[in-house]
From Swiss-Prot:
Family matches, as PROSITE patterns: LIPASE_SER
Subcellular location: Secreted
Name this polypeptide is given: Phospholipase A1 member A
GO molecular function ontology, one term from the record: phospholipase A1 activity
Signal peptide span: 1-24
Length: 456
């Protein structure tokens, strides 16, 4: 206080202010970009659309640089000569930042030399799902306007890769539609099903929205779309009921969201790990598990598609086929990848009833099992076994003959047959390994045999 001396007090404060301004001119400007985080909304104020575009770079993967105006982009670390990857999240019921986004951004920056931009539309995706759907067109227009600024800086349409999660996949599809399908790539991570399964091609993600469109389906019986929407559609574990996810509703929120979000975690794992998440074209998951689809010749000419950043998913054929359903199995936790093998058992004599044989691969303290059925009056039964160990680390196979507990008069006659296996894709007979001698199986008694398979 300056009691009774207001003029003196004013002069002192003015001098201090002048000194602070003058001294600040001697401090070199900071080179650190200002970091901006995702917005937080709530049910009362989260339905009105408010978009942020946040740029992340390898030099500071935890710092999102707000790039909305042309000047923001020019003054940022954005590199127009690199590819650009946009991440678009989906519906945010509680108005919170996606829990997976930081890990996703870091994985992308490590895996690709590219600009990574997260589209934050927490405001607009919160509250009721249907209000978020109503914001999709407006959001798509805002993203399209933002991309036009990047194109003015020299970015090519073909270098833009949109990765959309759930509802964000259809946002990406609409943006691609606005650019007449000339964007480089769109990846849909379990594209949303409600309101979109019967939507027109203009309203949802489809193969015409980019030069290459892929979708990973993990929750087709609940929150995800059940129809193919890309050039290649991965139906992981059949597209529903992912291993490790709760099977009963008493698990609460995890029961509702686990299958749906598995697509995100699979993609992150594909970015972080080298083991391939390879899939195989087939008419259905049931047919795939039955061993009816063993290679990728039709329609990919032997190049099996893989989840991840590999160009066009590893598909080399031209022109690209559309809406191809491909199937793969996974484990319950990261890195999720498995090796798929065909297993076959050929009976020496036909039987008048179905024959069930349990096949177990043993190697390095890891076991994998599958049951195959030989229909009555048939000699051959086959199936697909998924195993974590590479083929050359499978040391033994255990075979066990089962009979149905529902049959009153049980035929316990032993069976005799030959066992063979081959890693997928089965492109030639040279990969097939058979147990040299016929195997005699008695009911419920396990038989162990050595296996020697080459690494592939």
């Amino acid at each position: 206080m300056c009691p009774g001396l207001w003029g003196t007090c004013f002069w002192l404060w003015g001098s201090l202010l002048w000194l602070s301004i003058g001294r600040s001119g001697n401090v070199p400007p900071t080179t650190q970009p200002k970091c901006t985080d995702f917005q937080s909304a709530n049910l009362l104020r989260g339905t009105n659309l408010k978009v942020q575009f946040l740029l992340f770079t390898p030099s500071d993967p935890g710092c999102g640089q707000l790039v909305e105006e042309d000047s923001d982009i020019r003054n940022s670390e954005f590199n127009a000569s690199l590819g650009t990857k946009l991440i678009i999240h989906g519906f945010r019921a509680l108005g919170t930042k996606p829990s997976w986004i930081n890990k996703f951004i870091r994985a992308l920056l490590r895996a690709a030399d590219a600009n990574v931009i997260a589209v934050d539309w927490v405001y607009g995706s919160t509250g009721m799902y249907f209000s978020a759907v109503e914001n999709v067109v407006k959001l798509s227009l805002e993203i399209s306007r933002f991309l036009s600024k990047l194109l003015e800086l020299g970015v090519s349409e073909s270098s833009i890769h949109i990765i959309g999660v759930s509802l964000g996949a259809h946002v990406g599809g609409m943006v691609g539609h606005f650019y007449k399908g000339q964007l480089g790539r769109i990846t849909g991570l379990d594209p949303a099903g409600p309101e979109y399964t019967r939507a027109s091609l203009e309203e949802r993600l489809d193969s015409g929205d980019a030069l290459f469109v892929e979708a990973i389906h993990t929750d087709t019986d609940n929150l995800g779309i059940r129809i193919p929407v890309g050039h290649v559609d991965y139906f992981v574990n059949g597209g529903q009921d992912q291993p490790g996810c709760p099977a009963f509703i008493h698990a609460g929120y995890s029961y509702l969201i686990c299958d749906h979000m598995r697509a995100v975690h699979l993609y992150i794992s594909a970015l972080e790990n080298t083991c391939p998440l390879m899939a195989f074209p087939c008419a259905s998951y049931k047919a795939f598990l039955a061993g009816d689809c063993l290679d990728c010749f039709n329609p990919f000419l032997l190049s099996c598609p893989r989840i991840g950043l590999v160009e066009r998913g590893g598909v080399k054929i031209e022109p690209l086929p559309k809406e191809v359903r491909v199937y793969l199995q996974t484990t319950s936790s990261a890195p999720y990848c498995v090796h798929h093998s065909l297993v076959e058992f050929n009976l020496k004599e036909k039987r008048k009833k179905d024959t069930s044989i349990e096949v177990t691969f043993l190697g390095n303290n890891v076991t994998s099992s599958v049951k195959i059925t030989i229909p009555k009056d048939h000699l051959e039964g086959r199936g697909i076994i998924a195993h974590q160990n590479p083929h050359c680390q499978i040391n033994q196979v255990k075979l066990k003959f089962h009979i149905s507990s529902r049959v009153w008069r049980k035929d316990r006659t032993p069976i005799v047959g030959t066992f063979c296996t081959a890693p997928l894709p089965v492109n030639d007979s040279k990969k097939t390994v058979c147990i040299p001698e016929p195997v005699r199986l008695q009911v419920s008694m396990a038989v162990l045999r050595d296996l020697k398979m080459a690494c592939v």
